[in-house]
Amino acid sequence: MLTFIPMYTRALQLSSFTSLFFLVFALVIVVTRPFVGYLFDHHGPDATVYPGFAFFCIGFILFSQVGGVPLLLLSAGILGIGFGALAPAFQTLAVQSAPPSRAGVATSTYFWSLDISVGLAAAVLGVVSDALGYPFMYGVVCLTSALLGLVYYFLWRRSGKRAGT
């Protein structure tokens, strides 16, 4: 969870690089967005969703092992690719799943769900990080990402609702 990054970098005595982490994260999202859009539009949601989950998982594993600035920034870039792939893909899937007259409702529901999940995850993962530490917590986030990839496969792809493909 991005919520804990400032606290984790402080614990690692890398807090002076927290802003740089978020800068790299944001720049990678912006730079990769056109490529992600192209992949989604020309190859369907699977071309962005599965790699997005993989990049997220790899990024959090790397982040859990950070000991210095290079790995901190590498993990920021990899997490940026993952987030930059998943966020627009799921927003597009939400909109494509609704009738055109309900696109606004689908968009607001997507963002409402995102906000709720971020808030709940922060609460649960706060307990995990207090009990077992940040590296373990980021391992849990990686495992959760992998499990959500499976949920996507079984609930979306298998349901035949392959929007945009």
Placement of each model-derived feature along the sequence:
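Helix-loop boundary and gating motifs at the non-cytosolic
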Residues: 1-8, 12-14
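Loop-to-transmembrane helix entry/capping segments in MFS-fold secondary transporters
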Residues: 15-16, 100-110
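Transmembrane alpha-helical segments of major facilitator superfamily
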Residues: 20-29, 114
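Structural signature of the two symmetry-related core transmembrane helices
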Residues: 47-62, 142
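Helix-loop junctions at membrane interfaces in 12-TM secondary transporters
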Residues: 64-75
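Intracellular juxtamembrane helix-capping segments at the cytosolic ends
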Residues: 85-98
